[in-house]
A protein has these predicted regions:
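Transmembrane beta-barrel strands of outer-membrane/channel proteins
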Residues: 146-148, 195-199, 233-237, 279-283, ...
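Outer-membrane pore/translocation modules
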Residues: 184-302, 357-359, 366-369
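Outer-membrane beta-barrel "beta-signal"
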Residues: 334, 369-381
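Short loop/turn motifs that connect adjacent beta-strands in outer-membrane beta-barrel proteins
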Residues: 132-137, 178-193, 271-275, 304-315, ...
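Boundary at the C-terminal end of the N-terminal hydrophobic targeting segment
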Residues: 43-46, 51
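Solvent-exposed loop/turn segments connecting transmembrane beta-strands
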Residues: 160-166, 206-210, 285-294, 308, ...
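Transmembrane beta-barrel domains of Gram-negative outer membranes and organellar outer membranes
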Residues: 50-54, 58-74, 78-93, 97-103, ...
Length: 381
């Protein structure tokens, strides 16, 4: 009797491959049986499932025409978008552009690539941002801000000496109440009702930080914006007051009861995402304390349009004012420094240098001039 041949040895890797193949066939059989039962068909016998010959895929054949619309037709990539200056108009950092869970055409477009794209309009009560924003270098704009400066102009209380170091603070803000329009993070469009108000306070650090003067402002702008253009029709009230401590120490100083109730028409246009031009004209229908009806204001701003992240970006702002009671004189203010813009809103924080020459923006001293330079910080929300 001839001995049985010894079977070839099977490695452990081969055994595992056989077991995986068997498991795959069993899973396929179960899946097909359930699918046939759900569809109301008779399942195939199990022996057919396991004994069916393996099918091979047809050979893959590719040609250049498969990647284009047809012979001779070439599809070009879209042209690159100009980004402008690196710091003022560069792309956002990946961690500061598109929040998680944000779908297409939402409040957070693709890293804010197109700030002016049309978006759906609807009603919004108390939206987070503004269609018409405050002028960065405007000395009578409602915001939170503070500046410390040295003024070489004569002191109104003692003309024989200079004003020296003074401290001006603005406590206020501008907010949107109601909007019919779009609601992106940056540069919304539509119709909007805003309110704005602030107290403009001047302290004298060299004299026990006495309150020299305070102006109070309240206004209601009606705003419309479409694309890169914004316009406003606004009313504001401004009144000037001499500080109580300054009044007690200088009882002979002639107090001015400067008051304006004014209608304003303003326009703003963004030539580039980071370059804004604006101008406005105001007519006061009620005047007191030397105020006269007409005033004009214009300026420009260069600032990063998109969220800056923690690194920030430089800014430059220039504003000029002209008023009828000053024989069409006024003042010019220049600010430059570093700015940070919020990720999920248009909130803007700035620090930098400020220079102002001309009529004192504290209207209690409207007929006195300033020539001042210093540092400041400003917050718009």
């Amino acid at each position: 009797m001839r001995p049985m041949p010894t079977p070839p040895s099977v490695t452990s890797e081969a055994r595992r491959a056989i077991r995986r193949d068997d498991a795959t066939r069993i899973a396929a059989a179960v899946f097909l049986t359930l699918a046939a039962w759900i569809a109301g068909l008779s399942p195939a016998p199990a022996d057919q499932l396991f004994s069916a010959p393996a099918e091979t895929l047809p050979p893959l054949s590719l040609s250049p025409d498969d990647f284009y619309g047809g012979p001779g037709e070439v599809q070009n990539l879209p042209p690159p978008r100009p980004q402008g200056p690196v710091l003022l108009d560069g792309a956002c950092a990946p961690d500061s552009c598109c929040p998680d869970g944000c779908g297409p055409h939402g409040g957070y477009p693709d890293c804010f690539d197109d700030l002016w794209a049309p978006r759906p309009w609807s009603w919004h009560l108390l939206p987070n941002n503004l269609i018409y924003t405050s002028y960065l270098a405007g000395p009578k704009e409602s915001r939170i801000g503070s500046s410390w400066y040295q003024d070489t102009a004569p002191d109104p209380f003692e003309p024989s000496i200079n004003n020296g170091w003074l401290w001006d603070t603005t406590l206020g803000g501008r907010a949107s109440i109601l909007r019919y329009g779009s609601d992106p993070v940056l540069h919304p469009q539509g119709f909007e009702v805003q309110i704005e108000g602030a107290a403009f306070v001047r302290l004298d650090p060299a004299d026990d930080r006495d309150l020299r003067s305070a102006d109070y402002r309240f206004g209601v702008p009606l705003v419309y914006g479409i694309g890169r253009w914004q316009t406003k029709l606004a009313y504001y009230h401004n009144s000037a007051h001499l500080g109580d401590e300054a009044m007690l120490k200088n009882p002979t100083f002639p107090r001015v009861n400067y008051v304006r109730d004014c209608f304003v028409w303003g326009n703003s246009y963004y030539l580039l995402d980071w370059l804004r031009l604006y101008g406005e004209v105001g007519y006061a229908f009620f005047n007191a304390g030397g105020s006269e009806p007409w005033e004009f204001q214009a300026g420009t701003e260069l600032i990063q349009a998109r969220p800056t992240g923690s690194r920030g970006a430089p800014f430059l702002a220039i504003n000029g004012m002209s008023r009828q009671e000053l024989d069409w004189g006024g003042n010019v203010c220049v600010q430059t420094g570093w700015a940070w813009r919020g990720q999920r809103s248009e909130k803007l924080f700035r620090i930098g240098f400020e220079y102002l020459y001309g009529s004192d923006p504290q209207y209690e001293f409207v007929f006195y001039n300033q020539n001042r330079a210093g540092i400041g910080m400003w917050y718009d929300f």
